[in-house]
């Protein structure tokens, strides 16, 4: 491991000065940050992310964190001898699996991240979409074409949900009291059934309801890549749809970009897909001229 470069006091002051207009831009604005399970990585990475979230709050930004946990869920299921199955990029979640998913997301990852933020000097509150009926959901359905018969079939994903409504009562109270909400992507149906919700989709629904200034999707890739695998720094909704249609955007990036489009259509000003493994990625995106990742806008 190489030593970090030494920055002179003058350079440190210059960096802070250059960040001022960006800080003013986001003053009292709400930023929703989806922190993916792959982006969490090691403990030091998660703690650095937590410090950056506290810094945002200290600069009068209102951060709302939504976290994933796919790798951690997979690890726990493997330990318990429960096989993981996926369809259309979503985990098929049966009755046994939803209990593990809730335990890992709301009981382990959520509280760990809350602890890191509080340790860094923030005041975080850990919740999931079930708390206060914050996020209500309905059963998600997907279709797939059978490769042999070419017949379209409906896939039963089990207890996987799609957000239907976001009640902002609890979130607005927390934000108004300068607390940092940390949300696990679980929701409940009208009948009280718990649903596992894709974290990107959950974050998009929350950001749209809040009319957030920015939605940041921290993942394990640099952003949207072109056909030469180079980062595309900026896209309009129209551009993004063209890239989906011609196959440039494919695989797991499609639902991420569709979440971005949905959030923008709900009133979010801009959405960024960026690499959460890059140190201080959130600060680089919000407080520097260059930014990082791919910005998608109207």
Curated annotation (Swiss-Prot):
Signal peptide as annotated in the record: none
Keyword Cytoplasm annotated: yes
Entry annotated with the keyword Flavoprotein: no
Superkingdom classification of source: Bacteria
Enzyme class (EC, first level): transferase
GO biological process, one term: L-arginine biosynthetic process
Residues the entry annotates as binding substrate: 69-70, 91, 196
Coiled coil (residue ranges): none
Record's catalysed reaction(s): N-acetyl-L-glutamate + ATP = N-acetyl-L-glutamyl 5-phosphate + ADP
Pathway connected to this protein: Amino-acid biosynthesis; L-arginine biosynthesis; N(2)-acetyl-L-ornithine from L-glutamate: step 2/4
InterPro entries membership: AceGlu_kinase-like_sf (IPR036393), AcgluKinase_fam (IPR004662), ArgB (IPR037528), Asp/Glu/Uridylate_kinase (IPR001048), NAGK-C (IPR041727)
Residues of the site described as Transition state stabilizer: 34, 256
This enzyme's EC code(s): 2.7.2.8
GO molecular function: acetylglutamate kinase activity; ATP binding
Key words of the record: Amino-acid biosynthesis, Arginine biosynthesis, ATP-binding, Cytoplasm, Kinase, Nucleotide-binding, Transferase
GO-annotated cellular components: cytoplasm
Cellular localisation: Cytoplasm
Role, per record: Catalyzes the ATP-dependent phosphorylation of N-acetyl-L-glutamate.
PANTHER family per UniProt: N-ACETYLGLUTAMATE SYNTHASE, N-ACETYLGLUTAMATE SYNTHASE, MITOCHONDRIAL
Recorded family membership: Belongs to the acetylglutamate kinase family. ArgB subfamily.
Protein known as: Acetylglutamate kinase
Organism whose genome encodes this protein: Rhodopseudomonas palustris (strain ATCC BAA-98 / CGA009)
